[in-house]
Every structure is written in structure tokens, then in C-alpha cells.
């Protein structure tokens, strides 16, 4: 009888130990899956921008951050703005032809540091707050117009905000000429109307990005934005 009780105790103890081990393993596994899933979600939301299709077609937006080791050779324009030296010949040719056509563009903004980008965003948020927006709404609205540091094409040196010398022509003159002709020089209007849901940025008729002549012509003819174009290359 004692042997039987002793045997039952051993069986019971082994069963309890098994349950503890099983339950502990299950919880640990579930936690690992949950944490791993969180990591995957974060990774899907925040990729590092890739130059797989060439430096000209690197997509930088709110979901694709500029690599920490990204390098460029900057050159300074006559008005103090800076751009990637690789796009200078095409930008200069475009501006020369525009002026010959009676249109007078200039680069209002070129390359920006992360600190400069942050300051612009902060100023935009402050402006909306002064208009009575809540903190959350001010931030959300500001980010429709100003990219977070690390997600702005201005930090690539490949994008320029173009304005008009209004003493000689109107802004509309410049924007209309650029819409019709910029692709010939490898530039596209990066944030066109009707594409905000894809680009994440409201229509900016002044923001132009160098993508190379071949891609620019195909984007111009198709009506795609850069995200759609690169997606079609995959």
C-alpha cells in the first residue's frame, strides 16, 4: 500500500512538473512570438531606403528612412543653396532653357541637414498651434507638408524647391513650364495632386526631384508618382 502511495506521489509530482514546464514554455513562446511580431511590424513600417534601382531612384518617405551611412558630394549654388553635385549639370541646363523661354526659376531650398529639417517641422507645428489646433492635430497637419527628419528628400541633396523671380514672371509661369518640360532634364514633380495617399505628402508644385532622364520621361508619360514607378520595376 505504501509503495502504491509512493508511486502515485511520484506520478503526481512528475505530472505537476510537466505542467509547469509546458505552461512556462507556452507563455515564453507566446511572449517571444508577440515581441517578434512587434519587431516585424516596426520593420515593415520603417524600412531603410534602398538604392537597388540606382541612386536616382532611391525612395525616401515616411516609411523609408535615409541610411545612416548615406553620403553625397554637395556643391553650393550662387545663392548659397546646396545640391548633390551629380544633378547640377541637369539643373543648370533646365534653368538656362527656362530663362531662354522667358521663365525665371531659382532654387529656394536645396539640401537640408536633419537639424534644419527638424526646425522647419517645429515651426510649422507652432504655427498651427497658434491657430488653435490641438497638439496632436498640429503635428498631424504639419507632417502633411513637412517630412520628419530622416525622411526628407532634401536630406538626399536630390530635391529642390523651385520658386519664381516674380520681378520677371509669375509663379504659375514657372510651375507650368516645369510641368511641361522638367522631365527632359531628368526631374519630376515629386508630390503631384491626386497622389497624396501614396506619397504621404500634399500637392507641392514647387518640389522637384532628380530621377534621371529615362525614369522622368516614363513617369511623365504614365502619370505615375515615384512610388508607383519603382513598384512597377520590382
Predicted regions, residues:
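Extracytoplasmic cell-surface/polysaccharide-interacting catalytic and binding patches
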Residues: 2-13, 17-234
Amino acid at each position: 500500500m505504501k509503495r502504491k502511495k509512493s508511486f502515485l506521489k511520484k506520478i503526481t509530482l512528475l505530472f505537476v512538473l510537466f505542467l509547469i514546464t509546458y505552461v512556462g514554455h507556452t507563455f515564453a513562446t507566446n511572449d517571444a512570438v508577440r515581441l517578434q511580431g512587434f519587431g516585424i511590424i516596426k520593420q515593415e513600417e520603417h524600412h531603410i531606403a534602398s538604392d537597388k534601382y540606382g541612386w536616382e531612384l532611391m525612395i525616401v518617405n515616411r516609411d523609408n528612412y535615409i541610411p545612416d551611412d548615406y553620403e553625397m558630394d554637395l556643391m553650393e549654388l550662387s545663392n548659397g543653396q546646396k545640391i548633390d553635385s551629380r544633378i547640377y549639370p541637369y539643373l543648370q541646363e533646365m534653368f538656362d532653357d527656362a530663362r531662354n523661354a522667358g521663365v525665371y526659376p531659382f532654387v529656394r531650398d536645396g539640401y537640408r541637414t536633419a537639424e534644419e529639417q527638424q526646425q522647419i517641422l517645429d515651426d510649422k507645428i507652432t504655427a498651427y498651434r497658434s491657430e488653435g489646433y490641438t497638439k496632436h492635430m498640429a503635428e498631424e497637419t504639419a507632417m502633411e507638408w513637412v517630412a520628419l527628419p530622416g525622411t526628407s528628400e532634401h536630406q538626399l541633396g536630390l530635391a529642390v524647391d523651385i520658386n519664381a523671380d516674380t520681378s520677371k514672371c509669375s509663379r504659375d509661369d514657372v510651375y507650368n513650364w516645369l510641368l511641361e518640360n522638367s522631365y527632359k532634364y531628368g526631374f519630376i514633380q515629386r508630390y503631384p495632386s491626386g497622389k497624396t495617399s501614396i506619397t504621404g505628402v500634399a500637392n507641392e508644385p514647387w518640389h522637384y526631384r532628380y530621377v534621371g532622364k529615362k525614369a522622368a520621361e516614363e513617369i511623365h508619360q504614365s502619370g505615375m508618382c515615384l512610388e508607383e514607378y519603382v513598384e512597377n520595376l520590382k
